[in-house]
Regions:
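Transmembrane alpha-helices and adjacent helix-loop boundaries
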Residues: 1-168
């Protein structure tokens, strides 16, 4: 390894690290927020909430990330807004939408892993469904979700390199 060459280009490496971290953190935060709602939607008994959530997750988990980036940057955003956004904005949107699908499955599985008796106990104490979810079910579920959410962050960090194809 020629360390002088690495040292000469250190500013470019630092800029690349900063862009990677920015894409990953923005994509992850948006993906967690949107994924929570999608995960709850997948558990809804209302079909008009359940089916769009289910289809969204299946489509985004079933298509390659690179294809999603191209469609969002070259087709979806220009057709909706009339112009293309920069590569960073398009990349963050693509990462958020993809990460949300995976996070939705993590949230759904985490919530369903909590024994049903917990909800029954909370309801018997007079809590509403929303209160029981917020105060009893979700705290227990989050403990089980931490490892897969960490794995999703690492996967998103790796996927952020695919944004390069629209940045170049």
């Amino acid at each position: 390894i020629q360390w002088e060459m690495i040292w000469d280009y250190r500013e470019m490496y630092l800029k690349g690290i900063w862009v990677t971290i920015s894409l990953t953190v923005c994509g992850y935060i948006g993906g967690v927020i949107f994924g929570l709602f999608l995960g709850l939607g997948q558990m809804s008994k209302k079909k008009w909430i359940y089916w769009p959530s289910k289809i969204y997750v299946d489509v985004f988990r079933g298509t390659p990330m690179l294809v999603q980036i191209f469609i969002i940057h070259l087709a979806l955003l220009p057709s909706i807004f009339g112009h293309s956004f920069g590569w960073f904005t398009s990349g963050v949107i693509a990462l958020v939408l993809n990460s949300a699908a995976y996070n939705a499955e993590i949230f759904r599985a985490g919530i369903q892993a909590v024994p049903k008796g917990q909800m029954e106990a909370a309801r018997s104490l007079g809590l509403t469904h929303t209160q029981a979810m917020r105060k009893v079910i979700l705290p227990q579920a989050f403990r089980r979700m931490i490892p897969p959410l960490g794995n999703e962050f690492i996967a998103l960090l790796k996927d952020s390199s695919l944004v390069m194809v629209i940045a170049a």
